[in-house]
Amino acid sequence: MLLGQPAQKSEVDIVLVALATPVLVGVYQDGKRIETIESHKKTSDILPSIFQSLMKQYEIKSVYFARGPGSFMSIKLVYIFLKTLQIAKGITLFGCDGFEFTDNQPIKAHGSHYFVKENDTISTKKLEGDGAVTFRLPDSIDEIRCSQENIAPLYVLPAVKV
């Protein structure tokens, strides 16, 4: 390193799960998680500051993100935010369905309705009990199935009874 030149930033991948509270962000180097960020703030409030901080510290190569199902507004916000980063910074995006981060457990939809995944089909079902699911970040990026081709939001809207 020459005097007066900034130190080279480490290249990392990011995993983002913002389908519910808390928002989870994992920083991965060589495929292994080296840092975890968890926030109970609104996605719209915390996402820009998290990524601003990460971009100061690291060179982000790619972002793996839960594209749904879950909070409709959060899904939309995350997609627009990450798509902007992809265009502006050349960051590669990988979309994952949210069940990759719940060990295929139901994801809260609304009231007593939950998103469930059976035979690769996502639907809504009414379930008894609190059904609180805990999202988790994998220790290794190799543990999740994501696609670079399928990054569009995964909106699964429950049927509304009239």
Residue ranges of model-derived segments:
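DPxDG-like acidic metal-binding loop motif
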Residues: 62-67, 73-93
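Oxyanion-binding and handling regions
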Residues: 1-46, 56-57, 88-162
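Short, well-ordered alpha-helical segments
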Residues: 41-48, 79, 83
